[in-house]
Amino acid sequence: MITILGPTACGKTRLAVSLAYRLGTEIISADSRQIYRGMDIGTGKDLADYQVGGTTIPCHLIDIRPAGDKYNLFAYQHDFHQAYASILARGMDPILCGGTGMYIEAVLKGYHLPDVPPNPTLRDRLQGKSLTELTLILAAYGPLHNKTDVDSAQRAIRAIEIAEYIKNNPAESTEFPPIDSLIIGLDLDRDTRRKRITDRLHARMHEGMIEEVKGLLDSGIPADDLIYYGLEYKFVTLYLTGQTDYESMFTGLETAIHQFAKRQMTWFRGMERRGFLIHWIDALLPADEQCEAVMKLYTANG
């Protein structure tokens, strides 16, 4: 398997699609929000990106759950392994592509995580704490727990709930075997990354980001559920429900996405410290040069 990872706005999908076309294979998404149907603009889910040379590259684990649903790492592991086994059975090496580091690390390491039930007592104890306080509590549980996507109090409380359950119910990593993968990271300097994020945010607003969120609210999805998803869905929902003005929404969202990208890179650097070999490629290289660099590594790795 080939794994393509990197921060938001670095061009992961473009590289993965080019490689999949070249190798005649399929992609498995590692994005915690692209799984939801109807959440398209805010997650960067442009299905046209998967068209190359007149061919549509199959991408698994996109649009598999309704918006408003709750999805977790336990479910992702099972869904990933179904897609992974299906692709292998058809004689292809899958390409895993995404920016949710916890999903990537869990499937590569073969972590076994249980389906964690709600803990009302713990939730009551955590209610009323700020996101900063909750993030500090979560950090005390160690590196395994995903802090990358925790940008609302609701998500932080759920992450702590999972971490607390695992601490009290330790499980051996036996259900899923580790996966040997060539890991490619797309590296983007900070200034370029920030500019891309800002430019992309302006573009998403022009493409109908606010209308997308309004449509989700009008379909009956509670505002709190959209806030749970964070980033665009959180900030635009706050704007549409009258809790902030447009300018504050935009600047707050822009800052949050910059912070999110920084947390992604922190996670990937942490993966290296935990023993993963990541081959970093300059994200500013032309697409064909990126593809050639990966192909050389892929061939060398057998």
UniProtKB/Swiss-Prot annotation:
ATP binds at residues 6-13. The record marks 100 as: Interaction with substrate tRNA. SUPFAM superfamilies: P-loop containing nucleoside triphosphate hydrolases. Substrate binds at residues 8-13. Pfam families: IPPT (PF01715). Keywords: ATP-binding, Magnesium, Nucleotide-binding, Transferase, tRNA processing. Residues 31-34, 154-158 are annotated as: Interaction with substrate tRNA. InterPro entries: Dimethylallyltransferase (IPR039657), IPT (IPR018022), P-loop_NTPase (IPR027417). Its EC number is 2.5.1.75. Its cofactor is Mg(2+). It catalyses: adenosine(37) in tRNA + dimethylallyl diphosphate = N(6)-dimethylallyladenosine(37) in tRNA + diphosphate. Gene3D superfamilies: P-loop containing nucleotide triphosphate hydrolases (3.40.50.300). It comes from the Bacteria. GO terms for molecular function: ATP binding; tRNA dimethylallyltransferase activity. GO terms for biological process: tRNA modification. Belongs to the IPP transferase family. HAMAP family: IPP_trans (MF_00185). Catalyzes the transfer of a dimethylallyl group onto the adenine at position 37 in tRNAs that read codons beginning with uridine, leading to the formation of N6-(dimethylallyl)adenosine (i(6)A). Monomer. This is tRNA dimethylallyltransferase 1. The gene is miaA1.
